[in-house]
Swiss-Prot record:
Organism, as annotated: Neurospora crassa (strain ATCC 24698 / 74-OR23-1A / CBS 708.71 / DSM 1257 / FGSC 987)
Annotated keywords: Disulfide bond, Electron transport, Redox-active center, Transport
Lineage of producing organism: Eukaryota, Fungi, Dikarya, Ascomycota, Pezizomycotina
Family of the protein in this entry: Belongs to the thioredoxin family.
Site residues, Contributes to redox potential value: 34-35
PANTHER family listed in its UniProt record: THIOREDOXIN-LIKE PROTEIN 1
Family matches, as InterPro entries: Thioredoxin-like_sf, Thioredoxin_CS, Thioredoxin_domain
Disulfide cysteine pairs (residue numbers): 33-36
Gene it is expressed from: trx
Name assigned to this protein: Thioredoxin
Record-annotated site: Deprotonates C-terminal active site Cys: 27
UniProt cross-references to Pfam families, sorted A to Z: Thioredoxin
Cross-referenced PROSITE patterns: THIOREDOXIN_1, THIOREDOXIN_2
Amino acid sequence: MSDGVKHINSAQEFANLLNTTQYVVADFYADWCGPCKAIAPMYAQFAKTFSIPNFLAFAKINVDSVQQVAQHYRVSAMPTFLFFKNGKQVAVNGSVMIQGADVNSLRAAAEKMGRLAKEKAAAAGSS
């Protein structure tokens, strides 16, 4: 996508992203969720700013159309942001998830993931 966000349409598509990208930020949202709509432009901006192919991706997962993934990660409130490293859920800045449209926490997490991914990409000889 031109905004840098990868829209996930199936559990297999999400599994593939986790297997091919070192760091992933996942936004679990619903079309009917007001706070999800409110934070979406900021999430897209973070994706545009920090995404690095194969090193950091920003995914959006609709909890109504990809229920299997939402249930697997026990997402019960929207939006919920989860963080992954090498396919496994990890904590960023002390939290394994951010629930709600908390722009400051999301910005801090995106910046940290961006720094980590940039370091890995540089070490791998990618820019």
